[in-house]
């Protein structure tokens, strides 16, 4: 257990109500500083000892800083290749020893084909292959609408990479894939984009589940809502059981843990 100190002069920037609430909940030292106890909780994965499955391997698209890749590997599936259009993102991944075995590439998904991965797949010889990717969210994000306050056609947005993603999927024919995006992709204004996803999954012979997830419900100290389209060549009925909840939910369900807070 450690103590985080908020010095007295901080209160010059808060309301009296906020100050009273903090003084009520936390200890105060002789100098008038608030002391907040907290436990170090590691969200680092660099030293995680993962036993990877031999039969399934993954290729990552739109890899960014590796969020989906981390989740994939924590689930025991080695990411053998990652791709992102931004060099800074790829350099970040290269410096993360959690992906020391992964081939990280700078590239534009619209300019590559499934043949790009022929040599890698011959070398790795996975019995089953999955692809994970979160196409750029800007065409579907609420934030973009708030900035411009204009109606947009997400299917005409050049940043919409749903079809290029499905082109790679159609060429590689993975046993399954993940398509992640922001919750607002399900807004009626983006119905055409969602229909494109469903139509392509069905045309390629995939069964699928749709999961709507709030990261706070699973022990992450932030409210981040995301949508996951999970597709498989076999029947799939994916569900998630939340592990955390607010005070009212925890009282109703003793199996739930209270939401994590950054201050904790």
Residue ranges with predicted function:
Residues 118-128, 140-264:
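Class I S-adenosyl-L-methionine
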Residues 21-173, 183-187, 192-195:
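Core alpha/beta nucleotide-donor-binding catalytic domains of modification enzymes
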Residues 1-80, 200-203, 226-264:
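S-adenosyl-L-methionine-dependent DNA methyltransferase catalytic core
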């Amino acid at each position: 257990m450690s103590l985080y100190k908020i010095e007295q002069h901080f209160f010059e920037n808060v309301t009296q109500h906020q100050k009273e609430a903090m003084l009520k909940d936390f200890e105060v030292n002789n100098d008038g500083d608030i002391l907040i106890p907290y436990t170090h909780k590691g969200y680092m994965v660099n030293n995680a000892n993962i036993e990877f499955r031999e039969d399934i391997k993954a290729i990552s698209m739109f890899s960014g800083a590796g969020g989906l890749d981390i989740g994939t590997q924590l689930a025991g599936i080695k990411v053998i290749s990652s791709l992102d259009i931004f060099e800074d993102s790829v350099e970040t991944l290269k410096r993360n020893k959690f992906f020391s075995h992964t081939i990280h590439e700078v590239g534009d998904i619209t300019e590559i084909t499934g043949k790009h991965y022929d040599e890698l797949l011959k070398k790795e010889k996975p019995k089953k292959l999955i692809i994970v990717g979160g196409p750029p969210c800007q065409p579907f994000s609420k934030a973009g609408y708030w900035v411009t306050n204009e109606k947009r056609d997400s299917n005409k947005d050049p940043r919409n990479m749903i079809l290029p993603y499905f082109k790679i999927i159609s060429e590689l024919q993975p046993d399954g894939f993940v398509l992640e995006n922001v919750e607002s992709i399900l807004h009626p204004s983006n119905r055409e984009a969602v229909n494109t996803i469903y139509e392509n999954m069905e045309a390629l012979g995939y069964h699928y589940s749709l999961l709507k997830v709030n990261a706070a419900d699973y022990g992450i100290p932030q409210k981040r809502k995301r949508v996951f389209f999970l597709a498989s060549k076999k029947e799939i009925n994916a569900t998630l059981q939340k592990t955390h909840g607010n005070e009212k939910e925890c009282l109703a369900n003793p199996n739930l843990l209270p939401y994590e807070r950054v201050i904790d």
